[in-house]
Amino acid sequence: MVSIPRGFRDFPPPMMILRKRVLSKIEEIFRRYGFDPIETPSLEYWETVKGKLGEEAENKLMFIFPDFFSKEWYTLRYELTFPLARYVAMHPETPLPFKRYHIGNVWRHEEPQKGRYREFLQCDADIVGSPYPEADAEVISVNIDAMKSFDFENFRVRLNDRRLLTGVFEEELGINNPFPIYRAIDKLDKIGVDGVKGELARLGAHESLIGRIMELISTRGSFNEISNTFRRIENDKVKVALDHLEEIFSIVSDDRLVFDLSLVRGLDYYTGPVFETSVSEPRIGSLAGGGRYDRLIGLYSGKDVPATGVSLGVERLIDAGLELGIFDLSERSYTDVFIVSVRRENWRYAWRISRILRERGFSTSLDLMRRSQSAQREYANKIGAKVIAFVGPSEEETETVTLYSRDLRKTVKISELIDSLREFLSVS
C-alpha cells in the first residue's frame, strides 16, 4: 500500500490555497516592519550545529545522516536561527542592524501528535546587531500584529528573561548551572507540575530545592508587582533583566503581553528575554515564540553579535484557526473561470477567449480532455471554478461569451467581457 512517513503530510489544493494566503499575510507584516528575505540550504554540516542546540535536540530530535560520497555528516534544518547565525558569520560585511525574514521548512524527529509534525513550516523575523529592548519590543510587536491580522482574539504573549531566573537561582538557591533546570521547566505544559518535579529529582535536586524552584516559577501577578519583589535581590543579572523587561512592557503596551516566570524555552542559546504565544483554546501548544540570543553568532564568527527574533509556527496557526472557525477551506481552486466548449469545433474560439482573460490577469482553464459539454461543466464544479463561461456556435458567430455562476447568467460581447467577469466574481 502506498503511503508517506509518519509526521509528514500532503496538502491538497484547498489547504495549499489557505497556506499561501496565511503566508502572504505574514510576509506582508514582515515587510511592513522593514525586514528583508533570505534563503538558506535545507541541509547544514552536522559539525556546524553540533554542541550548540542542547542535548535533547541533538540526541533525539535532529535528522542526522552521512553522505556516502564525501563521508561528511549532514543534518536537516532543525530551525531557522542557526542558519541565520552561520549566514551572518559568513557575511561580516552585512550592515547592522540586519533585519531578515526567512520562511522555510524545518524537520524534527518528534513523536507526531496534534499540532506536532516532523516536517513543518516556520516564519522567522530576526534583528541582528541591536542589544537594546527596542529590538525585542519590535519582534514581539510583529508577533502580536500577526495574531491580530488573523483575528485571533483570546491569545496572550508570555514574556520572561532568562537572566532574571539565572540571577535568582544564583542568589537565592545557589544554582550556578541553570540550563538542565531550564530544560526541565520548559516541559511544564507537556508533562505538568508532577512531571517537572520528577525531572528535577532525576537531575539530583533535593525535595526542598524542588519546592523552592516550583514556588518561584509559580509566582503570579503583574510585572510591576513581581519586579518590586525581585528588585530587593542584589544581583546584576536580576537588575539588568528587570530594567530590560520594563522597557519592553513600556514600548509594546499591550494587555496581551503578560509576565510569566515559568517561561524559559528549551534551547540553550537564549540569553535574555524569551516569549511564547498561545491561545486559550484549542490547547495546541505555542503558536509563536522567540527571544534574544546574543552569543550564538559568536560561536561561528568568534565575536559575539547581539540578536533577537520571533518564529511563527504556520502549522499550528492554521490548525488552531481552522478549529476556531477563523480559517476555512471554502476556496478549492484559484480558477476564476472555466471555459466550456459547447462543441469540439468551438475549442479554438475558447482558446482565444482564454488568452484574452489570462492577459488581463484572470486564472483561466479550459477543456483539455475533449469531453462533452456536461462533463466539462461537471469538472468545473468539482474543482471549484468561480465562473463558467460557455462558448458555442452562436457565441462564436456573434463574438460573445455566456457567463454563468450560481446566481447570475449573462451573454456579453468580448468588449464587455472583462467588466462583466469582474461583476460575476464580486458576487461568486
Curated annotation (Swiss-Prot):
Record's Pfam families? HGTP_anticodon (PF03129), tRNA-synt_His (PF13393)
Q: Key word Protein biosynthesis present in the record?
A: yes
- Quote one Gene Ontology molecular function term: histidine-tRNA ligase activity
GO terms, biological process: histidyl-tRNA aminoacylation
Q: What is its EC number?
A: 6.1.1.21
Q: Which reaction does it catalyse?
A: tRNA(His) + L-histidine + ATP = L-histidyl-tRNA(His) + AMP + diphosphate + H(+)
Indicate where this protein is primarily found.
cytoplasm
Q: One GO cellular component term, please give it.
A: cytosol
| CDD domains reported in the protein's UniProt record | HisRS-like_core (cd00773)
Ordered alphabetically, the record's keywords are:
Aminoacyl-tRNA synthetase, ATP-binding, Cytoplasm, Ligase, Nucleotide-binding, Protein biosynthesis
List localization entries: Cytoplasm
Membership in a protein family: Belongs to the class-II aminoacyl-tRNA synthetase family.
Q: Kindly give the HAMAP family that the UniProt entry links to this protein.
A: His_tRNA_synth
NCBIfam families cross-referenced by the UniProt entry? hisS
This protein is called Histidine--tRNA ligase
